[in-house]
Regions:
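Non-heme Fe(II)/2-oxoglutarate
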Residues: 1-74, 79-84, 118
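Catalytic core of non-heme Fe(II) oxygenases with the double-stranded beta-helix
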Residues: 79-178, 184, 189-204
Length: 204
């Protein structure tokens, strides 16, 4: 069963967002993802349930979907737009996946697109394409296609848009980890990077 999405605009004040950012950056471990000679993103991970991070939980917990447990928490600093993927599967994780949660840490001229298409077991969009038996037809509005120039045009013919999330500071978006999703090409819109709190939840 797929979960209903939750979207709340401007849920957290600017002061609260700054507090979250500062608290997380004080306790996080930073790693970089580099491929083909360029850095795609930095990930600032922290242990959500560590006693030292109680102040972070006190801010976030009241707004999380009921019956969820956080199994990964990090600030994502994206330097290149994410392509099509789901978050359903992660190495060593045998729990039942629930939500991906995004909380932007600033205002950005950027959107996350969630598509109606999903996968129960794989993050890789190529796996979905291999099993696809439907008609290849462009069902995405042309104005949206123009924001997805980092994707292969043919891939868009497998997809239809479920919902769109605007990256505004302190907003909250939770959607089922099984759905394929991606960023727009925010570089084309003039943004050099973007940062957000990302949480992955599983069944308790």
């Amino acid at each position: 069963m797929l979960l209903e999405s939750i979207q709340k605009n401007n849920l957290f004040s600017a002061d609260t967002v700054q507090c979250l950012n500062d608290c997380i950056m004080d306790v996080c471990t930073t790693s970089e993802y580099v491929a083909d000679g360029k850095m795609y993103n930095r990930t600032h991970k922290w242990d959500y349930y560590d006693d030292a991070n109680k102040c972070i939980r006190e801010i976030l917990d009241p707004h999380l979907p009921e019956g969820t447990t956080i199994n990964q928490s990090h600030i994502l600093e994206s330097l290149y737009p994410f392509e099509l993927h789901s978050d359903v599967s992660h190495s060593g994780d045998t729990s039942t996946p629930q939500y991906t949660v995004i909380i932007p840490l600033d205002d950005y001229k950027s959107q996350t697109f969630v598509f109606n298409e999903y996968n129960e077991s794989s993050n890789d969009f190529e796996d979905y394409k291999t099993e696809y038996t439907g008609e290849l037809k462009l069902r995405i509005p042309k104005e949206t296609v123009l924001t997805l120039t980092h994707l292969h045009p043919k891939d868009l013919m497998y997809l239809s848009i479920k919902e769109t999330f605007e990256w505004t500071k302190g907003s909250f978006f939770a959607f089922d980890r099984k759905y394929y999703h991606c960023s727009d090409n925010y570089l084309k819109a003039g943004e050099k990077s973007k940062r957000a709190i990302l949480l992955w939840t599983v069944e308790q």
